[in-house]
């Protein structure tokens, strides 16, 4: 009888243990936080380990015909200064001269491919979005950059294949807000009172 009592009591205690709830952000939260940041906190240095953690997602995502043509150059530490002058951020706000001095991305991921074509472009979008979502999950952020000087970038980093895009990575130090837009409205992003605003069409406006 004593043994049965002890077994029952042990079971009761096990059931009373507090359950550990892991508060991971939802996909909706990650997507909403994944903005194109053009200003970063220089105090948060992005390391090689951070970048490798972001790249962990790449083998998990889709690739056309499973060709997996993309290759990645990690640029961090002092080498990030090689990339700063070769990329441009905020083309719609030339008067802002973004990024401001001292607010450049802490690190970069340069995405390359020896192959080209529509499937590679689709792979590029899938991989870039996935990497940036992982960055947000890690408390960081980034920007998908297509406005850069590819030949000079390839030479500066001694890349063996053509750079297709650059991801700037860092700890964002700016506030970005999405605002509703209607068909016919300007969709240009803008800044007001130190905040950045991005007009977004609503689901009902996207339906055919």
Can you describe what each PLM-predicted range is?
Residues 1-208:
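Acidic, surface-exposed loops and disordered segments
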